[in-house]
Swiss-Prot record:
Pfam families, per the entry: PA14
Subunit details: Homodimer.
GO BP annotations, alphabetical order: cell differentiation; negative regulation of sorocarp stalk cell differentiation; positive regulation of sorocarp spore cell differentiation
Ranges of biased composition (kind: Low complexity): 355-404
Gene deletion effect: Cells appear to develop normally; however, conditioned medium from these mutants show reduced prespore-cell-inducing activity. Conditioned medium from mutant show no cell division inducing activity.
Domain of life per record: Eukaryota
Organism for this UniProt entry: Dictyostelium discoideum (Social amoeba)
GO terms for cellular component: extracellular region
Name recorded for this polypeptide: Protein psiA
């Protein structure tokens, strides 16, 4: 029963669509991508000619044309003036970036509409021999970019000659529709995702037509219609579309563009900037439902930037949100009861082991010696030592002293010795009296705990020595590790302040000229200067573009 109802509704819908009275005009929403030859050298190349086979015969997975080759040495790319094939992806897709360097691929999306008028023949037509829809718009809001003129005219009229546009519509196939096009430069038309019009390259106006009855389409079925057009060279821009297709839009983005991507009303740089250089700011997905009372920034997304460093479980990658730079911090191994941290493994992390058991000297472990075995010493045999000769165990600021374990009665000797005490950690006992003659060993009672030497308190610019018995002065390397871990910032100078402790300051300092700001190369540490263009900068050459260069080498000490 449900199937019958569905078939009835579908038949009713098709009947209405097929029999409804056609409109006097057909409005087609388009997205124009303004281009600038500075940012994409595929625009304003040398004069070319009509070139087929620039693109593949099927649309890519993103619904856009795909070049047959991404080498600029192939015949089709050379003849079609595709100097930088890798930038072709920005012909019909947004690339709103802050980069303004040569061939960065930057473009400027703009929403427009084509109005096709219905003629007496029943076809819809758009005909324009001077197709310049974005003069003074996009990049050309800046007068410095209005440098391209109509060289064929006597008055050298300015126009915006560098742009591409595309639209993505649907149509219900009736069985006898046609599509005709005349224009320049590149034009590609795809019906049901298959290439049916192929007029690539920079060329004078060229024509192509399609009889849809020859494409193997099914009457009454809805198909996609994708149109792609580029104007890449002065001095003309021609376009003529004639079709009997009843094109319509099946969905709109939040900017009101048919099957748009949201780029005509959302710029990630200006609308989504969260001032965090450790995130990639993007506009919301095109199908996002936007509350008109809220700003577009409320719906922006902020994705963490990929970690460029090779980190493991012993080092953690950290990004500075102010500078966007990454550095490594050593993993801090927490203390665990009953275990000792012995290091770190990059795959498993912190390594813990039980403490080493120190042998305890008990009466049963002490060898029993008879008087005949025990060497007897008379006072004459006992070396007399003055206080200055008293053997002492002195701790020096060198590697931790090693204690020698004696299991037999030591013979008298002027050499200082360290007695092993039954504690987990070996310590050195200081002897200040002359040893008496050794008698027969008896079970030794458990000694009292030896007091641990007091750890000195170091100042802000001091650190404990390796044996933790005295303080040493911190150097710049100590401060660098304290402040930034294992990441050395070449643009900072590390030092120690007696009150504040370790500090770092900018290596590159502001000079006397307020219109030249210091710039540091984070890879080399070299200092240079850039000219400031600002209303607050009162200079004779205010507003002029340029740069100053100065090189300085700062050495951390």
């Amino acid at each position: 029963m449900k199937l019958l109802i569905y078939l009835f509704i579908l038949t009713f819908y098709k009947t209405i669509v097929l029999t409804q009275t056609p409109s006097t005009h057909l409005d087609v929403d388009i997205t124009i991508y303004d281009q600038l030859p500075l940012y994409n050298n595929n625009f304003e190349p040398e004069t070319g000619s009509l070139t087929k086979n620039l693109v593949q015969t099927t649309l890519g997975s993103d619904g856009l044309p795909v070049l047959n080759s991404y080498s600029n040495l192939t015949y089709s790319n050379k003849n079609g003036r595709m100097y930088s094939p890798e930038l072709f992806k920005y012909f019909f897709a947004p690339n709103q970036i802050s980069n303004t360097t040569f061939n960065c691929g930057r473009n400027f999306p703009i929403k427009k509409q084509l109005k096709l008028l219905r003629t007496a023949s029943g076809n819809y037509i758009y005909d324009n021999d001077f197709f310049f829809p974005i003069d003074y718009e996009g990049f050309d809001t800046d007068p410095a970019n209005r440098i391209y003129k109509d060289d064929e005219s006597t008055n050298k009229t300015y126009h915006n000659y560098h742009f591409c546009f595309q639209f993505d519509n649907r149509f219900l196939f009736k069985g006898n529709e046609t599509f005709k096009f005349t224009g320049d430069d590149d034009v590609w038309v795809f019906i049901n995702k298959q290439l049916v019009v192929d007029l690539g390259g920079t060329h004078p106006a060229a024509s192509s037509s399609v009889d849809l009855s020859t494409l193997g389409l099914t009457v009454g079925k809805v198909y996609p219609f994708n149109f792609f057009y580029c104007e890449r060279h002065t001095s003309r821009s021609t376009i003529r579309i004639e079709t009997s297709l009843e094109l319509y839009c099946d969905k709109y983005d939040y900017c009101g563009v048919c099957n748009g991507d949201g780029s005509t009303c959302c710029n990630p740089i200006t609308d989504c900037n969260d001032d965090d250089l450790c995130t990639n700011d993007v506009c919301p997905p095109s199908d996002t439902v936007i509350d008109p009372s809220l700003p577009i920034s409320f719906y922006c997304q902020h994705h963490p930037t990929p970690d460029p460093l090779v980190s493991d479980k012993c080092f953690e990658s950290v990004c500075n949100s102010t500078t966007g730079s990454w550095f490594l911090n050593a993993t801090i191994c927490v203390e665990k009861e009953g275990l000792i941290n012995t290091g770190c493994d990059g795959n498993t992390g912190c390594i813990y082991e039980p403490p080493t058991q120190t042998p305890t000297e008990t009466p049963t472990q002490t060898p029993t010696e008879t008087p005949s075995q025990t060497p007897t010493e008379t006072p004459s045999q006992t070396p007399t030592e003055t206080p200055s000769q008293t053997p002492t165990c002195t701790q020096h600021p060198t590697p931790t002293p090693t204690c020698t374990e004696h299991i037999k009665t030591p013979k008298p000797t002027p050499t200082p010795t360290c007695t092993k005490h039954p504690k987990p950690t070996p310590t050195c006992t200081e002897h200040t009296k002359t040893p008496k003659p050794t008698k027969t060993l008896k079970p030794t009672p458990t000694p009292k705990p030896t007091q641990t030497p007091k750890v000195p308190q170091c100042g802000k610019c001091e650190k404990l020595s390796s044996c933790k018995t005295y303080c040493e002065k911190k150097d710049c390397d100590d401060c660098q590790r304290e402040l930034d871990g294992y990441k050395f910032d070449r643009c900072k100078t590390y030092s120690c302040d007696p009150i504040k402790g370790c500090i770092k300051t900018d290596k590159c300092k502001q000079g006397n000229d307020p219109c030249l700001k210091p710039v540091c190369n984070q890879y080399t540490g070299f200092c240079s200067q850039e000219r400031v263009v600002s209303d607050k900068c009162k200079c004779d050459d205010k507003g002029k573009k340029g740069f100053g260069l100065g090189i300085g080498i700062g050495i951390n000490a």
